[in-house]
Amino acid sequence: MLELLFLLLPIAAASGWYIAYSQFSNSSSSKKHECNREYLRGLNYLLNEQSDKAVDTFIKILEVDIETVETHLALGVLFRRRGEIDRAIRLHQNLIARPNLAHAQKLQALLALGRDYYCAGLLDRAERFFFEVIDHDDSEYARIAVRYLLEIYQQQKRWEIAIKQAKKISKWDSKIFKNIAHYHCELAQNLLNTQANQKEVIKLLELALKYDAHCVRANLIKGKLAINAEKWEEAITIYQAIKKQDPDYITETLEPLNQCYLQHQSGSIGLLSYLHETLAEHAQTSLSLAIVKLIQEKDNDKALQFLTQQLQAKPSLPGLYQLVDLHLAQENCSLTDKSNLNSLKGLIQKLMENKPIYRCLSCGFNSKILDWLCPACRNWSTIKPL
């Protein structure tokens, strides 16, 4: 009830202004007085949770006085927020049916009706009304409608038409190019899943990079294709390019790079050189641990010394876990020490199990897997490794 009162405040304010204005401008009009009484009656129905009667009352007023359109739109939003979608739809449908609506008012009503159907999950109907807004106008209402269409197409995975609509937005918002790049990546991934011609896949990935040069996802897929074709040099070049695209995703390149360097003539020496160079530029725990793994293959003591220095500069649970492993690998580690270290290792592991691996920089959504589209805030490329 308290929430309803807060939602009604702007409507009540608008209604109060409208009533005062109509009385001031035409105090002799019995029709205006009747509208005023009906408005108060409608608000009373709302406050008493009699929504159907409220809708009937407001529709009746609309038939008499077109000046109440803005308030009717606000009421529609109120019903939608309360989850009373059917009543919001009815109110907006009656608005659209009015023959003397101003152009902007009709666009608002069409957009509102599209949003009603979108919230109700009736995406086909929502799409129809959003297109009607776009066909009529190129204003802010049309821009909002296009964004809703993109949400629909993303849910339905209709990537070709999503690209077409997103290009319309690019006229006034260059940030949409990031979305377009991901749509091409989605198409490329679909082709890969059907074992299609890889040339077509590469073409789509190149288009993705054309729209967004920082599209890490496109290069991750390209790198995987190069590995599958055993083109190790090419794969290394692709994965190393990700460091410049977005260093936050360096972690995602370490395992495939290790695979590539094992087959490359420079071997682990080449990989170690690259990792040290990258660590000097970007102090990331994943890089330190990758270096430790390579050093440990030849000298456990040096690996222990290196990791200790890294942890002093940047403590982390994965680093501490690896440090315990290095101590366990020491030749002079006693049985008692091993028992204590294994207990500590188990505790660290439990702490790590409760920690997310990825987090959305936009909304804070935590995840154990890398989603390119955040399921919470619906933004692309905002989920990154921690």
Model-predicted regions and their roles:
Residues M1-S30:
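N-terminal signal-anchor transmembrane alpha helix of single-pass membrane proteins
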Residues T71, Q105, A109, A142-A145, ...:
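TPR alpha-solenoid repeat register
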Residues I66, N100, A104, D138-E140, ...:
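Short coil turns that delineate tetratricopeptide repeat
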Residues N48, R82, A120, Q156, ...:
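Structural motif corresponding to the intra-repeat A-B loop/turn of tetratricopeptide repeats
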Residues R41, L75, L113, L149, ...:
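Structural register within alpha-helical repeat arrays
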Residues K31-E67, A74, R80-R90, N94, ...:
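Alpha-helical segment of the N-proximal tetratricopeptide repeat
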Residues Y45, F79, Y117, Y153, ...:
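Residue at a conserved register position within TPR or TPR-like alpha-solenoid repeats
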Residues I89-A97, R125-V133, W159-K171, N197-A208, ...:
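Alpha-helical repeat scaffolds
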